[in-house]
């Protein structure tokens, strides 16, 4: 199953935040943020930190997409 973090990037724009601001607020590193920018998987711990920093739910920042072969 593929993931998309477009919702997260849209939320950052809506809140006038830069990725670097989120990295600091959530305590995540630049490498992790880059993975998310490329729609690569990250741990649930990272998602939890981001949700806590942004005061949101996981479904507010990530979409789970079906694989092409399904």
Which residue ranges define each predicted feature?
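Alpha-helical residues within the helix-turn-helix
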Residues: 13, 24, 52
């Amino acid at each position: 199953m593929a993931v998309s973090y477009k919702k997260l990037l849209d939320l950052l724009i809506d809140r006038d935040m830069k990725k670097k601001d989120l990295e600091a607020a959530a305590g995540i590193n630049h490498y992790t943020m880059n993975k998310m920018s490329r729609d690569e998987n990250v741990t649930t711990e990272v998602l939890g930190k981001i949700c806590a920093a942004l005061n949101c739910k996981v479904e507010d920042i990530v979409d789970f997409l079906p694989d092409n072969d399904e």
